[in-house]
Amino acid sequence: IHSMKFGINRLIHENSLNNIKLDTYEYNNIGIIDDVLKEKIESSDYIIVASLSSNANHLKPGAWNRDLPRSVIDYGNKLNKDTVLISLRNPYDLAAYDNAKAQVVAYGFKGMDPTEGDTLFPTKSSGPNIPASMGVVFGAVEPKGKLPVDIPSLNNDGTMNTEVNY
């Protein structure tokens, strides 16, 4: 979350983004939308969901780190919200989120040190991927590049098959 806030604050500082109210929700080990998250989705214009999958089990139905992002995207879509999924680690999880209206691959999950707060000029090391993905999401940076791997489709049980999705 800190790296996302940093990226947004940097965009505001650079006059690439204005008039934004940011609300966040950190999910960990929960697979369903609670009332707090539901209210946040309902009151938002745009939904950005970050996913972090480090192994094939995280792509299967029943895995909290797959189910909650999917549920958030589904609920946002039901309310006609713009939804974006940011894949933070391995891009294979994109196949699990074909319900998102847009997908961004950050290809790096190392965020900022949370002890630095929301500063524009961090002094501790951090990964550039998450802040840069905020630039892509908000249109300040044009996405470029090609994934170095194919993203296969998923079977209903969350296992990968040989059909290339992306």
Spell out what each predicted region is.
Residues 1-166:
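C-terminal non-catalytic regions of proteins with extracellular/luminal or membrane-system context
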